[in-house]
Structure formats: structure tokens, C-alpha cells
Amino acid sequence: MKKKKIIFSGGSGRFGKIFQEVNLNYKIYFPSKKLLDITNVKKINSYIKKIKPDYFIHCAGLSRPMNIHYKDLSKSIDLNIIGTSNVVKVCQKNKIKLIYFSTNYAYPGFKGNYKEESALLPFNNYGWSKLGGECAVNMYKNSLILRICMTEKPFLHKKAFADLKTNFMFHEELANILIKLINKKGILNIGGKIQTVYDFAKKHNKDVKKTSARKMLGKKYPLNQSMNILKYTRIKNKIF
């Protein structure tokens, strides 16, 4: 049986490198930034015409450091909003299923337990840039938006916030289940159980120390960025 083809943008990033190690029954292409320039519709179209993929997993874009989305507004817009819009245009034109990596930062981050249909109000420019990409993806019905909360393994920091709740999961968990999700459509929150960053980190690094997001990031910083992952959990339970 002929393997279906997937183009994965952002293969040189943290998650992309881990995803490349997963043994899958698909032919997956990880083009370089030069080969697949998402700011150039003609280049995207040319590469897609050559590969003829069944799926396009769009993970490429600008993420860290977070202040880059303030310091270089043009780059943030070009990559995360316009670049994503370009990918949508080409996928729609060629009838390719699109899977888009978004973020839990699309939610306000104050009340927590946000469902996929909850009101959106990003609390920083990174969240706005990813939500801008979502707007384009939502216009294309043959798509799946993943609002993801994940981090590197092992936990990189010596201190962790004891007053900030979220849904951290490691890249490896998503890498191992992503391929099982690609035929879904709509919007899906992806992450681990709701807990403080400190509680998550402590399970994997006993030496991590407590610190306060309120003290470090200010009184206005949202402290409950957690998502409701019931839909994701139900899907995962059916798979395994």
C-alpha cells in the first residue's frame, strides 16, 4: 500500500526535531526554511506541486523569545499571520488537509479551564500572532487547529512558578500521538493535566525550586492559563 505524504513545516525547531525521530507509516518531508519559505506563496506552491502531499502540518513560525513579538513586530506578523495565511491559500488551492499548531496563549489566561469554544483574548503579542494565523485556518474547513501547551524535556529551568496554572506536556507525548489526530477537523486543546508549573516540573526534577510569576511578571500577568482537555482525552483514550 502506498504511503500517504505529509509536509511538516518547522522541522528544524524543537518539536520538529523530536517528531522526526518518530517511526510512522507515512512519507514525511521536513523541508528547510529556504526550500519552503512560508512568506512566499509561489515557493510554497512550487514545493507542494513537487511533493503532492495529502497533509500539511504547519508548525513553522516565530515563537521565542516572547519579547521578539514586540521588538520585531513585522517579523511576527510576516511569519505567524501572513505566512500561515499563505499556507492556507496553497492548501485550499490543492485540496490538502491542513493541521495548524496554535497555542493556549490564545485564551485570556485568568479563569482557566478554557474550552475550545471559550472566548479568545490573547494576553501577549505571541498569542495575537498565533490567533491571527487561526483566523485564516478557520476559513478553510479541511483543517485542524491544535491549541497546544507543551515544553522541553527535561524541564530546563532551575526555578518554576508555584502560582501559575497551565497544562504542560512534553514534546514527546504530542510527537507520539500527533499522527493519530491528523484526520480530525475543527479545534482541539492539547496538553497535560491542570497543575502549577512547579508541580509539573517537580515530578521530573526534584531539585527545582519555587518562584512566583506574580512577583516576576507583575500583578496583571494571568495566572490560570489552563485549558479544558476533555475532547483530547476522549480521543486519546479511544486510540490507546
What are these regions (language model features)?
Residues 3-25:
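N-terminal Rossmann NAD(P)H-binding glycine-rich loop of SDR-like oxidoreductase domains
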Residues 24-47:
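Adenosine-cofactor binding site in Rossmann-like domains, unifying the SAM/SAH pocket
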Residues 41-79:
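NAD(P)H-binding glycine-rich loop region in Rossmannoid oxidoreductase-like domains
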Residues 62-74, 103-123:
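Active-site "gating" loop of Rossmann-like NAD(P)-dependent oxidoreductase/epimerase domains
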Residues 70-99:
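NAD(P)-cofactor binding segment of oxidoreductase domains
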Residues 121-149:
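Active-site Tyr-X1-5-Lys
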Residues 148, 155-183:
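Substrate-positioning beta->alpha
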Residues 177, 181-224:
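Mid/C-terminal beta-alpha module of Rossmann-like enzyme folds, strongest
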